[in-house]
Amino acid sequence: MVAITLPDGSVKNFEGNTTVMEVAQSIGTGLAKATVAGRVDGHLVDAHDPIVADAKVEIVTPRDDDGVDIIRHSCAHLLGHAVKQLYPDVKMVIGPVIDDGFYYDIYSETPFTPEHMAAIEKRMMELIKQDYDVIKKITPRAEVIKIFEERGEDYKLKLINDMPGEEAFGLYHHQEYVDMCRGPHVPNTRFLKVFKLTKMSGAYWRGDAKNEQLQRIYGTAWADKKDLKTYIQRIEEAEKRDHRKIGKALNLFHMQEQAPGMVFWHANGWTIYQVLEQYMRKVQQDNGYEEIKTPQIVDRSLWERSGHWGNYATNMFTTSSEKRDYAVKPMNCPCHVQVFNQGLKSYRDLPLRMAEFGSCHRNEPSGSLHGLMRVRGFTQDDAHIFCTQSQIQQEVADFIKLTLAVYEDFGFNNIIMKLSTRPEKRVGSDESWDFAEKALADALDNSGLDWAYLPGEGAFYGPKIEFSLKDSLGRVWQCGTIQVDPNMPERLDAEFVNEQNEREVPIMLHRAILGSFERFIGILIENYAGWMPVWLAPQQVVVMNITDKQAEACENVVNELKKSGLRAISDLRNEKIGFKIREKTLERIPYMLVLGDKEVESGSVNVRTREGENLGVMSVAEFIILVETAVAEKGRQTPKIDQE
């Protein structure tokens, strides 16, 4: 007898072993038809996996987040089924679930085209209509190897070789197609009807550019058509907001092959950059940070002592001169310790907060570069706090509060916080990691805010809290971090004199709020579709004449606005005023001032907004107050976005 406890506390008894599907059938045929998988004592299992002992069971349906993820994972297998039917010579690699969808990496001698993707999607739909069952078989290792050898699936064999301790594997049979997976998967293809293949890209085996190139096909899948339609609309909107397109249209920046991963900032884009830097400089000054500047090229001996040379060398640009090896700094932290080490510090000097707008370079793979979002040369709003163990919790708590306030200024209110713990490749003792992880967890707990763990995702020198923003399209961007690091100060001989007049190694907190200026500007561009809040707009005001007679008056107004600290330009072209207004609206300039004879005579301006609102006639002084009020609101007042 097997006793099954359901979420409502009721108990059902079964003679002998049972399955999630049988439990669902005992409740009702409707639930059984909707069953995708189940949770047995908290663990996800396939609908037909045997339950051999008393257990707590939850039925998973497409209405559950887990159910949608299972549908997506099964769609990846369905994609494999379709691809192998159409192109038998290709070799399947991996097909995981990702945010909002899935992908499959495939090795093919022939490059895939959009026509190939359309054919694959069509075949997937045909297979779904066959309404076949997906069969799971736990298969001994030797038999699994034989199956994939016979099918010529070299990459599956390599994956098996990576798991020497596994004596058996789960094989999922989609008719004649077989794939290897831990599961769970849907019991039948009828659950996979709501999907769409979305794009293709290149990838490398094991993510290493030295290995063979693969072709990656992306897709999305949902529980119902309405969710799919909403997602497709969101993707289309994201394409309109692509920061590379908007950056070109608004003359913000460009990239070119002669400097891969490096940004050529134009005047408009550099203005946004400078506004961010000036804002962050004041934030840091107001919160007790001292700003420093350190070298960009440093001898390898420092990077060896810090641990970067052994743990991060492949991502560092190096050079040599006069028989010495140097690295262009990928991070600022070792250099900040050098500043701390100049002069003996007392416990009375702590916490010591050092900030730098540090220019860093990392040798990212060329295939991963993506506009401002993934670059090789970037600037961080970087800072390091040297403190005692007893000061960690308060410093982290203060940083959390500061970070959330900064994000609110940029219009981001939906913030996700996660604690990334020790990775396999790391420096320092387990005891130091235990202490550091607990310090961050305690600070998060005491903040009263929701947070989650990210196991194994910490930096090699310490755990960290990651702050992720959810933008206006619901996308999540990881930006800020704070990391507890007891290791680097010790490696680089940092010390202070404690209250007992003894030498002690300080704790080092690595922290950034924006992350990199480049990436954060890219996020802002896409979040606002280029319609920046007034305080961030490259040009806040354009002054336009109706005829040549008002040209001088326009220039006088521009000068008055500039003296008040506003970013203003004039448009004195001999064009119709309607044409000029339309053009400057497309340039996303927040305010347009029109001067005709009446305005010149009265010393006033006619004010229009980029949203098309006519604010009427007012004095220049009144207009300046209007703009200063909008600037003070920062990103708390979201601009109306017009995609026309």
Curated annotation (Swiss-Prot):
What quaternary arrangement does the UniProt entry report?
Homodimer.
Question: Catalytic activity, per the record?
Answer: tRNA(Thr) + L-threonine + ATP = L-threonyl-tRNA(Thr) + AMP + diphosphate + H(+)
Could you list this entry's UniProt keywords, alphabetically sorted: Aminoacyl-tRNA synthetase, ATP-binding, Cytoplasm, Ligase, Metal-binding, Nucleotide-binding, Protein biosynthesis, RNA-binding, tRNA-binding, Zinc
Q: Which cofactor does it need?
A: Zn(2+)
What Pfam family is a match, any one?
HGTP_anticodon
Question: Is-annotated flag, keyword Metal-binding?
Answer: yes
Biological processes, Gene Ontology terms: threonyl-tRNA aminoacylation
> SMART domains, alphabetically?
tRNA_SAD
Record-stated family: Belongs to the class-II aminoacyl-tRNA synthetase family.
Q: List the disulfide bonds.
A: none
Q: Say yes or no: keyword Transmembrane present.
A: no
Where are the residues of the annotated region Catalytic?
Answer: 242-533
Instruction: State where Zn(2+) binds.
Output: 333, 384, 510
Subcellular location per UniProt equals: Cytoplasm
Species assigned in the record: Psychrobacter arcticus (strain DSM 17307 / VKM B-2377 / 273-4)
What does the record give under GO molecular function? ATP binding; metal ion binding; threonine-tRNA ligase activity; tRNA binding
Q: How is the cofactor bound?
A: Binds 1 zinc ion per subunit.
Recorded GO CC terms: cytosol
Q: What class of enzyme is it?
A: ligase
Describe its function. Catalyzes the attachment of threonine to tRNA(Thr) in a two-step reaction: L-threonine is first activated by ATP to form Thr-AMP and then transferred to the acceptor end of tRNA(Thr). Also edits incorrectly charged L-seryl-tRNA(Thr).
Q: What is this protein called?
A: Threonine--tRNA ligase
Enumerate the spans annotated as TGS domain: 1-61
